[in-house]
Amino acid sequence: MNILIFSNAMKEQDFALYQSEAKIKPNPSNQNFYYKLIKTLAINNNVSVVSHRPLVKGMFRKNYLEGDTVFDGKIKFYYTTNRCDKVFKLLKEKSVIVKTAKQAIDDFMSEDFIIITDTLRLNLLKAAKKVAKLYDTKIIGMLTDNPFNLSSGSAFVKKYLVEQASNLDGYLSLTNGLVEVFNSSAPSYVFEGLVCEESEGKKDPIFNYFYFGGSLYERYGVKTLVDAFHKSNVKNKLVIAGSGPLAEYIEQMAEDDYRILYLSQLSKEKNIAYMRNSIANINPRPLDPKMDNESVPSKLLEYLSIGTPVISTKFPKLFSTFKDDITWIEGNSIEDMKYALEHYEVPNQEEYLKKAATARRKVFEFYGLNVQAESIDHFIAEINSSTKN
């Protein structure tokens, strides 16, 4: 089957270069998820990606990105041109994406294909819908979050985005709650995420530390983690990596508390190395019925796939599966976090490692690329066949 994906995702090596050169660091979570989705779809299908790379003013020395076409194994990435100016965004961006998609379709040498699109980037979504209409083909939306949960963008744009994404032919979704937000009557396949084998990045640690790597937002529990650690009697260090609004606060806390180390945004390889060598990786995202219903803490699945012990809040969708394999934080408060950190018994690390190995086996059984590829392919085939009825 030919699959055309509309996304911001890039070839992994290209994203690493893009991230290293960017003055304003992009959040890698979108890249990480979509790249795994692309690899999953490419296991049994012919996949091309229309990649509209993120670009904001001041991100690079030049305020534009040139188009290009690159191979990643048998996957073909079609990079669109992109500019920072408002005229381009308002009048030209969608048509540039459509033009790039037409090139990808010509290279399929067949108009028998199906579209999968990001649903959180407005012009990308509108371009995907236009291409679907031009070629009379089915379009599936990938639901990763509710636009109203995002920190940027006006309420009007978020409402419009949901409206634009609410009339697609089907949905791949990370939660049932997202299907309810966009279109509960359309066909959908729900899976909490994807995990894959990562490069070793293994080095002997020079000190014992707990680790968090991700977006530095208070709503994700990062401030609670830092404050709890600062108040704790833990002798080991806390290493924080990532970028976001709390970066300045964490830098200040690191100056005040020698046990806290802030590393800013790391490359994927360094992030993996820190995860592999930690005493335990921490998912501090607080329990919140709305957020839990509409988004998945992707870091938790990533941590589980590494095989290092995990300390986490009780995300409902994963708690029952990994009940005995994770050190659970009982609540959302600083005291709950402090208790979990202080009662993590480092002398019993071998027992924690055994639990981590069990968790790793389970997470690949449920969310490994090959496992999910079969289910996702079956769903896409059902959507695609409905065009011929």
Q: Model features per residue range: what roles?
A:
Residues 220, 269-274, 283-302, 311-321:
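Nucleotide-sugar-dependent
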Residues 34-39, 123-126, 130-135, 143-171:
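Membrane-proximal helix-turn-helix segments that form the acceptor-binding/catalytic region
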Residues 326-335, 342-349:
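Conserved acidic donor-binding segment of nucleotide-sugar-dependent glycosyltransferases
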Residues 33, 144, 148, 161-201:
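Donor nucleotide-sugar binding/catalytic pocket of nucleotide-sugar-dependent glycosyltransferases
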Residues 4-6, 201-220, 225-230, 238-239, ...:
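Conserved donor-binding/catalytic core segment of Leloir-type glycosyltransferases
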Residues 248-275, 280:
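Nucleotide-activated donor-binding/catalytic signature segment of Leloir-type glycosyltransferases, i.e.
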Residues 1-63, 170, 227-233:
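N-terminal subdomain of nucleotide-sugar transferases
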Residues 56-58, 90-100, 115-134, 329:
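An aromatic- and histidine-rich active-site surface loop
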